[in-house]
Amino acid sequence: MAGFVLPHDHGEGGHIEDLHRELMNAAHFAAASEIFKQLSDPTRVRIFWLLSHREECVINLAALLEMSSPAVSHHLRSLTESGLLVSRRDGKEVYYKAADTAQIRMLHEIVEQVMEIACPERAVDSQASQEAIIRHVHDELTADL
């Protein structure tokens, strides 16, 4: 049996069978899709970016974003449920920050690359490092597929 064959051969070669097999397993793409869905909202991107730099409580986030606390809480709940953020309670206050995982750190770097802004703690400087970050993010996001 010849395996998967495309209707038009453009001479690109490659491992089309492997690519096709991955494409047909749509469940593999669900986690990445959910993360990108969360980051499709500009307010959530702003919150994620800020909380990648520091832990904050809802009241301070609302002040920084010039939004109501309930509106901020709505976004925080969604980002936390998706695994992008983590929270901790200290008395009556709940503090939020970006989850401390390699994937979340890479998403933070991607957000900064797309926005062309530098993280206050460091600056990403070269095209080569940008490409390395993108490759690393791809590898991390598809590692468990």
Question: Language-model features: where?
Answer:
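N-terminal helix-turn-helix DNA-binding core of bacterial DNA-binding proteins
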Residues: 26-70, 94-102
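Generic detector of contiguous secondary-structure segments
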Residues: 72-76, 92
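Alpha-helical residues within the helix-turn-helix
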Residues: 63, 74, 80-81
